[in-house]
Each structure stands twice: as structure tokens, then as C-alpha cells.
């Protein structure tokens, strides 16, 4: 009998941390920031996030395809929540970062976490995010946990000393090419 109230409490708490559906249409305030997008199709918003200003969307699960929104990461803050500040400190955003520093910040963050065994920035080119000058870049990496080769495409900009970054990542085989058009359509709808 003592177990029944505990099970009821756990069942009631589950929806509070559940993933949620992102329906087509205007979606303001992504990653608790000025970012807004208009998805054409449905996405799933994952409840677990890597930080206060991070939001992750996926279609099939974050290991198969995911878009991460980093919204307004300010000076002195990291892209992701730090797990071990002493042994694995993450790089911090600087208000004076150049656009060309953004790919290196992402790579250094992934490497500092020990989450990747190999990573390379493959291309970099000027772009726009909304009306802002930005950098678009592609990268590839292999996670230490599953050794699956993944590809990524990202766009980032600095606004008033804060970083706005959107990344798309998926396994190189099949999923990256299958869903890249959905990411790019979402990217074209982004506003700051």
C-alpha cells in the first residue's frame, strides 16, 4: 500500500518532463531567446536540454537527426551545461568573438566534453541569419560512445555580444541526406 502513492506521484510527474510536439506554424521564443521559426512539418522538442538557452528538436530521436538551437548565449557562458569545471572546462562565449570563431567554439566544446574522438570543420562561408551577418559551416565527427560517423551543418551569429547558433546533426549514412532539406527549410524561416 505504501508503494501505491509513490507510483501515482511518479506517474503524475512524468508529463512535466515529457517531450512535446512542435506543430507547423510560427514558433517564437526558441531556446528562451529572440529566435523564432516557422516549421513546415512536425518536430519533437526534447525535454532534456544541455543548458538554459538550448532547445533540441528531432524527428526520429536525437541520435538519428537533431537540430539544436543555442539562443542568446551571453559573455562568459558556455554552449552547454558544464559537467566537470575542473577537469573538463568548456570554452566560454566572448562578447568580442568574430563570426569565424563560432565553428572553433563548437568544436572545442565537443572535444572538451570528451564526447567526440574525431571532429573536423569541413567548410565555412558567409551567410545571413534573419537580417544579421552570420557564418554557415559544415563539420563531421565521431562520438566516442557509438563510433558512428556523423555530419553537421550549422549557422551562427553574434547579436549584442550574445551567440545565436543553430546546428543540424545526423549519421552520415542515410539520415543526414534524408533530412537536410527539412533543416534548411526551417533555417530559411528563422528570424531574430
Protein language model regions, located:
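N-terminal targeting sequences that direct proteins away from the cytosol to non-cytosolic compartments
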Residues: 2-87, 105-107, 111-118, 126-132, ...
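Long, charged/polar, surface-exposed segments that mediate recognition or autoinhibition
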Residues: 100-103
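Beta-strand secondary-structure signal
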Residues: 136-138
